């Protein structure tokens, strides 16, 4: 078999920042991460540590690293979210070539929601609403997570930042 796999990656700091913002936006919903008695998950840094070791993010990052270690990445087309937002047509042309299908010009200012998800199944992190216009969200991870937590994320995932050429 010769499977063709496409994986979009994103700066892990931005992913954890997004999760932290969802956590803060929903103080009335218990995502089972914070335990005041045990004093776990009560700080941003602790929550990032928990997310980095559990589903969905931690598991995915660990499996991605294992795939690369086993050299299974040779048949994968990787896109960085940040690059895709800057040059979507260029990336889509590569995608169409990868799948050996005829290119279709997309309208990045009129994106339609064609799928539906049961967001309630994902708790506070379930947000599968597609924006109608392709725009990169601002990099606010230093403000949301703090510099120390951002540095820890990079240090603990150096392979990720090197492999995908994040600075």
At which residue positions do the language-model features occur?
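PAPS-dependent sulfotransferases, especially Golgi type II membrane carbohydrate sulfotransferases
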Residues: 23, 27-29, 51, 66-70, ...
């Amino acid at each position: 078999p010769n499977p063709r796999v496409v994986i979009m990656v994103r700066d892990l700091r931005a992913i954890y920042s997004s999760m932290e913002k969802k956590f803060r936006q929903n103080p009335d919903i218990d995502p089972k991460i914070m335990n005041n008695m045990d004093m776990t998950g009560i700080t941003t840094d602790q929550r990032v540590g928990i997310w980095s070791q559990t589903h969905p993010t931690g598991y995915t990052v660990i499996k991605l690293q294992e795939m690369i270690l086993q050299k299974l990445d040779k048949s994968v087309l990787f896109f960085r979210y940040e690059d895709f937002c800057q040059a979507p047509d260029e990336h889509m042309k590569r995608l169409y070539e990868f799948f050996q299908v005829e290119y279709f010009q997309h309208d990045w200012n009129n994106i339609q929601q064609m799928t539906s998800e049961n967001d309630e199944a994902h708790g506070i992190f379930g947000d599968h609403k597609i924006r109608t216009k392709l725009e990169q969200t601002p990099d606010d991870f230093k403000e949301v997570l703090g510099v120390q937590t951002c540095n820890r994320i990079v240090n603990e995932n150096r392979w990720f930042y090197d492999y995908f050429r994040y600075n």
